Amino acid sequence: MTEQISVGIVGIEYQLPCYKIDEAEIAPKIGWELNKIKIGLGMHEFGVVGHKEDVVSLALSAVDNLLVKYNVDPKDVGKIEVGTESHFDSAKSIKTYLLQLFNDNVSIAGCDTTNACYGGTNALLNCLAWMESSFCKHKYAIVVCTDISMYDSKPAVPTSGAGAVAMLIGRDPVYKVLPKTLFTYSTNEKDFLKHKSRYFPYIEGKESVEVYKKAFSNVYNEFISEFSPDYFNYMAFHSPFPKMVVKVCNEFNIPLEKVEDSLLASRHNGNTYTASLYFSLISLIASNKVKMNDVVCLFSFGSGCVGSIYCIQKVKEGCEIEDLRERLDSRKLINYEKYEEILENMQNYAIKDEEEDIKGYSIVKEENYFRTYIKK
């Protein structure tokens, strides 16, 4: 990225799953005290998809919300990049499903990116580079982060979650990306694996925490060697669970008041993988504390491992998030038995014909494994 062209986030929207489950339902089923989850992990509840929701329906809804909120002409979009690690199709990208929202615009570049929870940030960096290049002939690019996290490993269950974030990227941004602040760390790690033979991931929990901390240590120390720790006003993290973010902040002397407001979605919707960092950003924006010229530092991490740190600066008004708490509260609360039923169907890639209050796109049929989606 160059200094000459200002590129960044013009708008941001999101989609939550239709259900949620309280950690009080989870604790006795995994043999934990509730405080081990609420205090030890910082989790209160997490989002759960319905029988007619998947990563594509969440992405469709998030992008549709974005297009409507910012009155985007589909012809003005020239690139769509999707970050995900939970797509059910190894060949056809989620991006191609999203094209049903763009009428006759068949010249949209881009596809999907996968590297655990980092794919969304890689998609963003791709779109930023395209936006400031001579290849760009359009007004906007769109970045989508969409994921569903579910586990059969009991210690990981309380950190489940689901959701999608869509970001409108352009040359007249509300949040300008500051290119010289980007630092990346990447190594070959064996902390997390999704094998094609099974739905659920293999997790080395303690090792993954250490890899996360090692990645952060490397990029943050590089960052503060060139910029003061006071350079940024707020910080948002990829949040596997809120207490992990708090521990990292304490270890690196980052004031918690710079971070606390960003943890709302993580506490109440769980780990959304590629979308996690950007739900943290949404939570921070929703607090209405970010003022003109404030700098927000972002830390992205994906097991395996890739980690990056970079900063954005608010340079104009816009990008408001006014209803996050209300949308979190409006999800239907389910019990553990319902959760188990959904879990079983998800790992079998089954779709149950059940009436659900889905505010957005949902699966209407599956034929020869191809799924069709419509908006209610």
PLM regions and their residue ranges:
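Condensing-enzyme catalytic core mediating Claisen C-C bond formation in acyl metabolism
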Residues: M1-K52, K154-E210, K214, Y310-K376
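Acidic, glycine-rich active-site loops and adjacent beta-strand->loop/helix elements
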Residues: E13-Q15, G83-F88, N115-G119, V144-M150, ...
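Catalytic phosphate/nucleotide-handling subdomain of diverse soluble enzymes
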Residues: I282-D329
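Conserved beta-ketoacyl condensing-enzyme motif
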Residues: I9, V55-N115, E226-F252
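Short, well-ordered amphipathic alpha-helical segments that serve as non-catalytic structural scaffolds
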Residues: E33, V55-Y70, I94, V211-F227, ...
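Conserved catalytic cysteine-centered active-site region
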Residues: K36-G40, H44-D54, S86-Y140, E251-S276
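Flexible, glycine-rich active-site loops centered on histidine and acidic residues
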Residues: E132-A166
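A conserved active-site cap/scaffold subdomain adjacent to cofactor or substrate pockets
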Residues: K206-I224, Y231-V245, G270
